[in-house]
Amino acid sequence: MTQSQVTPNAREALTETIVDAKVRKNLTFEAINEGTGLSLAYTTAALLGQHALPENAAKLVAERLGLDDGAVRLLQTIPVRGSTPGGVPTDPTVYRFYEMVQVYGSTLKALVHEKFGDGIISAINFKLDIQKVPDPEGGERAVITLNGKYLPTKPF
């Protein structure tokens, strides 16, 4: 039976345990994800408390991380999503995404509405990918793809 969390507390505590195990075992998220059949972004988000994992994936990652049966069950529960505490993020990496939305949010909204009409881009029917590519001017660049289904507003 599908279970749902009503507060972020249990998943936040599990996230701390997961990150500790990942560090102790010197694993990457990619290594933990291997064989789950899920995208790296989805599994990473689940391990950080933002998604539920299917039973087989929960068992696999728990085995890799040395987690108990309680953690396997908790990884399968529907979390309280978007539960980052504190409002405006203070972590520099997360803050840059917040800043990008602050600068380009109205542009994205205007262009989505111009191309699609009144509606939203789903974060439920959604895929995320990040690639590291060389910068022709030196260094590296991050190519981040946000691929969400367009959902039109339906008058009622």
From Swiss-Prot:
CDD domains: Cyanase_C. The active site is at residues 96, 99, 122. Catalyzes the reaction of cyanate with bicarbonate to produce ammonia and carbon dioxide. Keywords: Lyase. It catalyses: cyanate + hydrogencarbonate + 3 H(+) = NH4(+) + 2 CO2. This is Cyanate hydratase. Belongs to the cyanase family. Pfam families: Cyanate_lyase (PF02560), CYNS_N (PF21291). PANTHER family: CYANATE HYDRATASE. The keyword Lyase applies. Its EC number is 4.2.1.104. HAMAP family: Cyanate_hydrat. GO terms for biological process: cyanate metabolic process. GO terms for molecular function: cyanate hydratase activity; DNA binding. InterPro entries: Cyanase, Cyanate_lyase_C, Cyanate_lyase_C_sf, CYNS_N, Lambda_DNA-bd_dom_sf. The lineage of its organism: Bacteria, Pseudomonadati, Pseudomonadota, Betaproteobacteria, Burkholderiales. The gene is cynS.
